[in-house]
Regions:
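Broad gene-expression machinery/nucleic-acid interaction feature
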Residues: 18, 65-67, 116-118
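Short edge beta-strands and adjacent turn/loop segments
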Residues: 63-75
Length: 126
């Protein structure tokens, strides 16, 4: 492989890349409506964008699909979150997203059970 250094990294004070975040179908198991989960994800979308943008400053060609699996406990708190799959290969982005998700608050599942969510984000600069 090469050294990876190139001219014109594209970082400029006046330029800001638009970041595209697209959604795929989440996998949800448990007694919480999909719409309730998606609402919380949408409300926190800027946190996901932040995780990506910070690393994009350092690596201009960074993009990929990051799939996170998390468990919502009986009170609506995220009790566990982990990387399920990633084509991005950026531990900094992946760990940042996991940390953000751990702080999210969902509605309490019906009957106090747990809900498992697997959610994929596709992140790329446009």
């Amino acid at each position: 492989g090469g050294g990876g250094l190139g001219y014109g990294s594209g970082v400029g004070l006046g330029s800001r890349k638009d970041v595209g975040i697209s959604f795929e179908t989440p996998v949800i198991m448990g007694a919480l409506p999909k719409e309730a989960i998606l609402k919380v994800i949408r409300q926190n979308q800027n946190q996901i964008r932040y995780c990506y943008e910070v690393q994009l400053q350092k690596q201009q060609d960074l993009e990929g699909r990051v799939k996170i699996k998390w468990v919502i406990g009986g009170t609506g708190d995220v009790v566990k979150a982990q990387l399920a799959e990633s084509t991005m290969k950026s531990p900094a982005v992946e760990n940042c997203i996991i940390e953000k998700i751990r702080g999210w608050k969902f509605p309490a599942p019906a009957g106090g059970g747990i809900v498992e969510v697997v959610y994929p984000w596709v992140l790329k600069a446009s």
